[in-house]
Amino acid sequence: MEVPRVGHSISSPTSPCEDMMKNLSLDAIQLCEREGNKSLDSGIAEMEELPVPQNIKISNITCDSFKICWDMDSRSKERITHYFIDLNKKENKNANKFKHKDVPTKLVAKAVPLPMTVRGHWFLSPRTEYTVAVQTASKQGDGDYAVSEWSEINEFCTADYSTVHLTQLMEKAEVIAGRMLRFSVFYRNQHKEYFDHAREAQNNKMLPSVKDNSGSHGSPISGKLEGIFFSCNTEFNTGKPPQDSPYGRYRYQLPAEALFSPKTNLYFGDFYCMYTAYHYVILVIAPQGSPGDDFCKQRLPALDIANNRFMTCSEDEDGQLVFHHAQDLILEVIYTDPVDLSLGTVAEISGHQLMSLSTVNAKKDPSCKTCNISVGR
């Protein structure tokens, strides 16, 4: 069953009961406090003979949908006309609150064969823990409902964006990518102590670390993928990296071919903004066959390294590798393997450390029409 916005008709191509559900509708009902396991909704009478849902099972969980089914005693089963589904974010213990203006946490569905699909990006977010409980109900002639007791409360967590969702994000990013500019180096800014530690304690290597939670909440790489962040953007008038950086006054710089070549795979990771005009795309470079490559193959859209709208590596007429990046996006490039400092150089930048431009744990603007898709943010 697909859960619509209040007052909208619905259809559910993903439901196994599609034909039976074309005329289903959901309405908001008054939210209620619970005392014990009873419903105290005003205007709703309790009838003990209505069966209480038992053994609730939740399956087919995506970033903005799930299937739900349960067992019921056959007693008075034929009297059931509706199901009440009480859905709440786990951290919100008060069922008498709205998640968002005009969006109820309690859903009313016409009784249909189970399992049914609950879908709705306006009340389901990716990577979020929820609690769910169910009542059976019988609509009376006067419009009131007779209801069963509440089922036990069950918990589940929604999933990350799938490759289908990421492909939708990627297509939106392609629209604003702009023309391609040539570049020749990757660079990474940090504090002096970071590079000193790499030399002294890490055998002269920068080591991958787990990506933070910046960007889209549903991105499958946040908090999971290990890598090292690099930049490749250049100033259009000089063709060189900018002298300012939000991440530190010391910059490690190395030839682009040291990280990006036909021996690596390239993946699209995310597209987001931080309440500003700047838009960011996260790309992942993974040496072929590496653990990072295996991780990305299962979760991210792969890009043709020689032909995409974000960052390319191709051969010129002389067989030399040439590199280009999109002008109108800020690219954040994650390299999934350790990098030896001997492959490049460290030097202090002459510009400013612009802390306001840092994307560390930055939250995506959920209202931006340019970089959001119609699933959980």
From Swiss-Prot:
Please give the family membership noted in the entry.
Belongs to the PHYHIP family.
What is the documented function of this protein? May play a role in the development of the central system.
Which Pfam family, any one, appears in the UniProt record?
PHYHIP_C
- What are the residue boundaries of the Fibronectin type-III domain, all occurrences included? 52-161
Protein name listed in UniProt: Phytanoyl-CoA hydroxylase-interacting protein-like
Disulfide partners: none
PROSITE patterns noted in UniProt: FN3
**Where is it found, in Gene Ontology cellular component terms?**
cytoplasm
Family annotation (Gene3D superfamilies): Immunoglobulins
Q: Which SUPFAM superfamilies match?
A: Fibronectin type III
Judging by the UniProt lineage, the source's domain of life is Eukaryota
